[in-house]
Swiss-Prot record:
Gene field: mdtB
Family classification: Belongs to the resistance-nodulation-cell division (RND) (TC 2.A.6) family. MdtB subfamily.
Organism: Escherichia coli O6:K15:H31 (strain 536 / UPEC)
Complex and partners: Part of a tripartite efflux system composed of MdtA, MdtB and MdtC. MdtB forms a heteromultimer with MdtC.
Induction: The mdtABC operon is transcriptionally activated by BaeR.
Keyword Transmembrane: yes
Designated name of the protein: Multidrug resistance protein MdtB
Single Gene Ontology MF annotation: xenobiotic transmembrane transporter activity
This protein's GO CC annotations: plasma membrane
Domain of life according to the entry: Bacteria
C-alpha cells in the first residue's frame, strides 16, 4: 500500500506558480539587491565586537615605579574609577611611565567613553606633579591588540634623530588622521634633543651645582609673550633673541662668573645634539630603525583602515629624502584577505558539491538546474539584508553561508522531489506543481521555523562571545528564510515550466544504473526497517545508549575557547635578569635576533628595548616576528614557535616568550603568553609572599607551559638615606636632594626649544662615563644655606636594596599576572582545572583574590553557559514544533534524533584531535536543527497517511520512511557536503573553520545511519503511550 498525498490547490505557492513573469522579476530583484549589497559590504576577519577601550599614558622621566604609582597613577585611577560604564581598569607603573587601560561595557559608545576620560584627566590635573613634561595622553586603542601594520624607517646617510623627526612630523601625524587609526607609536625613541652632560668634578671645582646650572639654562631659554607698541599710526610687535636653537648656542651660554671671568656651559659640560631618551632603541631585522606601529580604534574596520594607509604611503614617502627608506614589515590585512578568500572558495566548492549531489539523486538536468538556481539566489540575497544590518564579509558570516548551502538546498529538494513524484504518476506539470507545493508547504514552514528556533539562543549569548556569533546566527537565519521563500515561489514555478514526464523519464546509462542502485538501497532499508520495528525495545536501548554516550563524551572531551589561528605574526617578549641595563639588554636582543632570523620560516623581525609606556622595564624587550606566507613555509605557527624557543634557549641569560597573534583580542594587557591568571591583594607585601609559592607549584604542572609572572621585585635600588638633622643644620631640604639627583641621573627635561614645526627638549644629566655605577653618587654636590658646596656623601648614606621594577594595579588594587600556555597534549579546560586545584591546596588568605583574565575568563563564561545554550535551543525547538503540530508528543519524537548528532560530532572531534571549543559548539547547535529534518519529513507524511488514508501507525510510518528515504538521504548528503570543505580546509584561517566542519560531518554521518531506524520506533512507542493515556482518561471519565 502506498501513501497518497492530500489534495491541494497550491496553498501559498499558487499565486507564484500562476504568475511566472512576476515571480521571475521578483527573484531578479532579490539577485540584484544581493549583488549590490555584496559590493557595499566591508571585509574583516571577524565581526567587530571590540570592547570600547582607551589607554592613558603619562611619562615622567626619571621617576621610580613607586613615585609613578603614588604621584601619577593613583590620582588618575581615583578619577577614572568614578566613571559610569567602566568594566575594568588596569594600570602599570614603571620607571618613568604610567599606563592605564580602561575597558568599558560593550553597550557604551567609544565617543562617550572618550568624553568621560577627558573629563577625568582634567579633574586630576591639579593632583599630578607640577613638573610633568607633558599632561596625560589618551588614545582610543586596546594595547593588547596587535598593530594592523608595522613599518620600519631606516637611513644609511642620516642619524636616527633626524629620521624620527621627519617621520613624526611628516608621516606619523598624517597616518594618525586616517579614519579608524587609534594610535601610531614610534618605537626607537630617537627624538632630537640637546643633551647637556655635566662634568661633576668641573662644576665642583668651580663651586657650582647641577641645580645652579639648571636654573641658568632655563632662565636663558624662554619663549613667552612680550607685548606690542601701539603708536598713533603704527603698531609694532615686540620680539627678542630669547630662544636658543642649537647645541652650539647652549655651549656658549654663560652660567656664572668667577673672579670676573665668565664660565660657559661648554666649560663644565659636554653639549651635543642627541636623542631625548638614550635608553630606547628599535631594530628592523639587524638594522637600527624607527619602527612605526599602527593600531586601530576598537570597532574600526581593519581592511578599510589599512587600505587608506597604503593609499597615503606613496605620497608621504615622497616628502622624505631619498636616503630614507620606508618598508612595510607586516600587514595583518594580507592574511585576513587570504583567509576570507579561502572561505569564499570553500563556499563556492560547497555550492558545487551540493549541486553535484542533487544531480546524482535526481539524474535529470532540468531538475538539477532548479535547486542550482535556488541555492545561489538564497545566498546572494542574504548580502542585501547584511548591508542593512551593518554586517561585514568575514570568516564567520562566510562560514554561515557555507553551512547554509546544505540548509537552503533542502527546501528546494523537498519541493522538487514531491512535485516530481506526481509528474511521474502522469499528472500535468502545472497540476503536479500546485498539488506538490501545496502538500509540502507546511513541511517547509515547519523545517524553516524549527531551524531558526535553534539559532535564537545564539542571539541571547552574553558578552563578547554573544556579540561575535550574532552575525553568524542572523546571517544563517536570513539565508534560511530567503530559501524558504524561494522554495515556495520560484522552485514550484520552475518545476511547472521545466519538468515533464518526458524529461523525468529520459534516462541514460548512468541514470538507469543509479536508479537500480537506489532501488536496491531502498529495498535493503525497507527490510532492515521491518526487522527494527519488530524489536522496538532493542532499538530504544540503542537510542538511550547514544544519549548516555553523548553525556560521557561531553564530560571527557578536551575543551577550549577559540581555535589558535595562524595569522603569520608572532608577538614575543624577551626577559633578562632584573638588574640588566639598557646596553646589556640591547646586546642580548641582538643575539636573539640573529638566532630568530636564521629560521627558514621567518621573513622579518622588529624588536624594541627601553621603557616608554609600551615596554614595562629595561630588562625586557618586545619582538614582532613576521613569518613567510603559509604557502612558502613548511610548518604552521605553533611548530615555528616551538622551534624558535628551542633555538633561543641556547642564548644564555634570557627567556623568550612567544604567542601567535589572533584576530580576536579580549585581553587589555600585553601578555607574554596566551592565557592569564591574576592574584590581587590589598598590599604588595601579600603578593610578594604568595606569588612565588604559587609560581613554584604552577611551573610543576604538566598541563601548563611557559609559566611566567610579571612580578619583578628584585630590581636594584640605590637607597639614599639622608640624615635629616645634618641636612637641616646646613639648610638643605629634601627637595634640594631630589633635585640634585634628578638633575644628575633622570635625563631631566629642563627646557623646551620651539620651532615652527615641532618642539624639542633640553636634557640635563651627569656625564657618568668615568664614574659608573654607585660611584657616581659621590660626585653629587648640594648648596648649603650659606652658599657653600656640600657633598651628598656628608649628609647621606647609600644602601643597595631591592624593589619592584613595575607596580601593577587592577581596579586600583595591587595585582600580579601569571601568564601561561597550554601544551599540545592538553586543553585549556585541563589547564584551568589544574590551576584551580593548585590554588585550593595553597589556602590563600582572604585578602588575596584570584581571577582568570582575557580569553581564559571568556572561556570560563562560555563553558558555563554552553549546556544552558543547548538546552535553550532544544526547548525553543520543542515550543515551535509543539505549536506547529498542536501536539506535546510529536515534538519529542522529532527531538529524539538529537543525541545521535551529539555522539557523532563529539566522536569526530576526538578522532580529529580537536577540542570542543566555541566554534565546535556552534556546529553541534546547528546539527540540532539539521538532524530533526529527517524526523519531520517522516512524521509529516505518516500523520497525513493516518489522517487521510486510515492507515495504522505502523504501516503509515513504514511507508513514510520508504517514501521519504531518498529526499532524507539527499538533504543529509547536501548538508554534509556543504560542511565538507570546512572540514578539509588547509588555507589561511583554516583553524577557525575546521572544528565546525568536523563536528557537522561527524554528526550528520552518525545521525543519518541511526535516525532512519530509531525515529520510526520512537514514533510508534509514543503513539502507544498516547493511546494508553487516552484510555486511562476515558476510564476515569466513565468511573466519574
Amino acid at each position: 500500500m502506498q501513501v497518497l498525498p492530500p489534495s491541494s490547490t497550491g496553498g501559498p505557492s499558487r499565486l507564484f506558480i500562476m504568475r511566472p513573469v512576476a515571480t521571475t522579476l521578483l527573484m531578479v530583484a532579490i539577485l540584484l539587491a544581493g549583488i549590490i549589497g555584496y559590493r557595499a559590504l566591508p571585509v574583516s576577519a571577524l565581526p567587530e565586537v571590540d570592547y570600547p577601550t582607551i589607554q592613558v599614558v603619562t611619562l615622567y622621566p626619571g621617576a621610580s615605579p613607586d613615585v609613578m604609582t603614588s604621584a601619577v597613577t593613583a590620582p588618575l585611577e581615583r578619577q577614572f574609577g568614578q566613571m559610569s560604564g567602566l568594566k575594568q581598569m588596569s594600570s602599570q607603573s614603571s620607571g618613568g611611565a604610567s599606563v592605564i587601560t580602561l575597558q568599558f561595557q560593550l553597550t557604551l559608545p567609544l565617543d562617550v567613553a572618550e568624553q568621560e576620560v577627558q573629563a577625568a584627566i582634567n579633574a586630576a590635573t591639579n593632583l599630578l606633579p607640577s613638573d610633568l613634561p607633558n599632561p596625560p595622553v589618551y588614545s582610543k586603542v586596546n594595547p593588547a591588540d596587535p598593530p594592523i601594520m608595522t613599518l620600519a624607517v631606516t637611513s644609511t646617510a642620516m642619524p636616527m634623530t633626524q629620521v624620527e623627526d621627519m617621520v613624526e612630523t611628516r608621516v606619523a601625524q598624517k597616518i594618525s588622521q586616517i579614519s579608524g587609526v587609534g594610535l601610531v607609536t614610534l618605537s626607537g625613541g630617537q627624538r632630537p634633543a640637546v643633551r647637556v652632560k655635566l662634568n661633576a668634578q668641573a662644576i665642583a671645582a668651580l663651586g657650582l651645582t647641577s641645580e645652579s646650572v639648571r636654573t641658568a639654562i632655563t632662565g636663558a631659554n624662554v619663549n613667552s609673550a612680550k607685548g606690542s607698541l601701539d603708536g598713533p599710526s603704527r603698531a609694532v610687535t615686540l620680539s627678542a633673541n630669547d630662544q636658543m636653537q642649537s647645541a652650539e648656542e647652549y655651549r656658549q651660554l654663560i652660567i656664572a662668573y668667577q673672579n670676573g671671568a665668565p664660565i660657559r656651559l661648554g666649560d663644565v659640560a659636554t653639549v651635543e645634539q642627541g636623542a631625548e631618551n638614550s635608553w630606547l632603541g628599535a631594530w628592523a631585522n639587524k638594522e637600527q630603525a624607527i619602527v612605526m606601529n599602527v593600531q586601530r580604534q576598537p570597532g574600526a574596520n581593519i581592511i578599510s583602515t589599512a587600505d587608506s594607509i597604503r593609499q597615503m604611503l606613496p605620497q608621504l614617502t615622497e616628502s622624505l629624502p631619498k636616503s630614507v627608506k620606508v618598508t612595510v614589515l607586516s600587514d595583518r590585512t594580507t592574511n585576513i584577505r587570504a583567509s576570507v578568500d579561502d572561505t569564499q572558495f570553500e563556499l563556492m566548492m560547497a555550492i558545487a558539491l551540493v549541486v553535484m549531489i542533487i544531480y546524482l539523486f535526481l539524474r535529470n538536468i532540468p531538475a538539477t538546474i532548479i535547486p542550482g538556481v535556488a541555492v545561489p539566489l538564497s545566498l546572494i540575497g542574504t548580502f542585501a539584508v547584511m548591508v542593512f544590518l551593518d554586517f561585514s564579509i568575514n570568516n564567520l558570516t562566510l562560514m554561515a553561508l557555507t553551512i547554509a548551502t546544505g540548509f537552503v538546498v533542502d527546501d528546494a529538494i523537498v519541493v522538487i522531489e514531491n512535485i516530481s513524484r506526481y509528474i511521474e504518476k502522469g499528472e500535468k506539470p502545472l497540476a503536479a506543481a500546485l498539488k506538490g507545493a501545496g502538500e509540502i508547504g507546511f513541511t517547509i514552514i515547519s523545517l524553516t521555523f524549527s531551524l531558526i528556533a535553534v539559532l535564537i539562543p545564539l542571539l541571547f549569548m552574553g558578552d563578547i562571545v554573544g556579540r561575535l556569533f550574532r552575525e553568524f546566527a542572523i546571517t544563517l537565519a536570513v539565508a534560511i528564510l530567503i530559501s524558504a521563500v524561494v522554495s515556495l515561489t520560484l522552485t514550484p514555478m520552475m518545476c511547472a515550466r521545466m519538468l515533464s514526464q518526458e524529461s523525468l523519464r529520459k534516462q541514460n546509462r548512468f541514470s538507469r544504473a543509479s536508479e537500480k542502485m537506489f532501488d536496491r538501497i531502498i529495498a535493503a532499508y525497507g527490510r532492515g526497517l521491518a526487522k527494527v520495528l519488530n524489536h522496538p525495545w532493542l532499538t530504544l536501548s540503542v537510542a538511550l545508549s547514544t544519549l548516555l554516550l553523548s553525556v560521557l563524551l561531553w564530560v571527557f572531551i578536551p575543551k577550549g575557547f577559540f581555535p589558535v589561528q595562524d595569522n603569520g605574526i608572532i608577538q614575543g617578549t624577551l626577559q633578562a635578569p632584573q638588574s640588566s641595563s639598557f646596553a646589556n639588554m640591547a646586546q642580548r636582543q641582538r643575539q636573539v635576533a640573529d638566532v630568530i632570523l636564521q629560521d627558514p620560516a621567518v621573513q622579518s623581525l622588529t624588536s624594541f628595548v627601553g621603557v616608554d609606556g609600551t615596554n614595562p622595564s629595561l630588562n625586557s624587550a618586545r619582538l614582532q616576528i613576521n613569518l613567510k606566507p603559509l604557502d612558502e613555509r613548511d610548518d604552521r605557527v605553533q611548530k615555528v614557535i616551538a622551534r624558535l624557543q628551542t633555538a633561543v634557549d641556547k642564548v644564555p641569560g634570557v627567556d623568550l616568550f612567544l604567542q601567535p597573534t589572533q584576530d580576536l583580542t579580549i585581553d587589555t594587557q600585553v601578555s607574554r603568553t596566551q592565557y592569564q591568571f591574576t592574584l590581587q591583594a590589598t598590599s604588595l607585601d601579600a603578593l610578594s609572599t604568595w606569588v612565588p609559592q604559587l609560581m613554584e607549584k604552577l611551573q610543576q604542572l604538566p598541563q601548563l607551559s611557559d609559566v611566567s609572572s610579571d612580578w619583578q621585585d628584585k630590581g636594584l635600588v640605590a637607597y639614599v638615606n639622608v640624615d635629616r638633622d645634618s641636612a637641616s643644620r646646613l639648610g638643605i631640604s629634601m627637595a634640594d636632594v631630589d633635585n640634585a639627583l634628578y638633575n644628575a641621573f633622570g635625563q631631566r627635561l629642563i627646557s623646551t626649544i620651539y620651532t615652527q614645526a615641532n618642539q624639542y627638549r633640553v636634557v640635563l644629566e651627569h656625564n657618568t662615563e668615568n664614574t659608573p655605577g654607585l660611584a657616581a653618587l659621590d660626585t653629587i654636590r648640594l648648596t648649603s644655606s650659606d652658599g657653600g658646596v656640600v657633598p651628598l656623601s656628608s649628609i647621606a648614606k647609600i644602601e643597595q636594596r631591592f624593589a619592584p621594577l613595575s607596580i601593577n594595579h587592577l581596579d586600583q588594587f595591587p595585582v600580579t599576572t601569571i601568564s601561561f600556555n597550554v601544551p599540545d597534549n592538553y586543553s585549556l579546560g585541563d589547564a584551568v582545572q589544574a590551576i584551580m586545584d593548585t590554588e585550593k591546596t595553597l589556602n590563600l588568605p582572604v585578602d588575596i583574590t584570584t581571577q582568570f583574565q582575557g580569553s581564559t575568563l571568556a572561556f570560563q563564561s562560555a563553558l558555563g553557559s554552553t549546556v544552558w545554550l543547548i538546552v535553550a535551543a532544544v526547548v525553543a525547538m520543542y515550543i515551535v514544533l509543539g505549536i506547529l503540530y498542536e501536539s506535546f508528543i510529536h515534538p519529542i519524537t522529532i527531538l529524539s534524533t538529537l543525541p545521535t548528532a551529539g555522539v557523532g560530532a563529539l566522536l569526530a572531534l576526538m578522532i580529529a584531535g580537536s577540542e570542543l571549543d566555541v566554534i565546535a559548539i556552534i556546529g553541534i547547535i546547528l546539527l540540532i536543527g539539521i538532524v530533526k529534518k529527517n524526523a519531520i519529513m517522516m512524521i509529516d507524511f505518516a500523520l497525513a497517511a493516518e489522517r487521510e488514508q486510515g492507515m495504522s501507525p505502523r504501516e503509515a510510518i513504514y511507508q513514510a520512511c520508504l517514501l521519504r528515504f531518498r529526499p532524507i538521504l539527499m538533504t543529509t548528503l547536501a548538508a554534509l557536503l556543504g560542511a565538507l570543505p570546512l572540514m578539509l580546509s588547509t588555507g589561511v584561517g583554516a583553524e577557525l573553520r575546521r572544528p565546525l566542519g568536523i563536528g557537522m560531518v561527524g554528526g550528520l554521518i552518525v545521525s543519518q545511519v541511526l535516525t532512519l531506524f530509531t525515529t520510526p520506533v520512537i514514533y510508534l512507542l509514543f503513539d502507544r503511550l498516547a493511546l494508553w493515556t487516552k484510555s486511562r482518561f476515558a476510564r476515569h471519565e466513565e468511573e466519574a
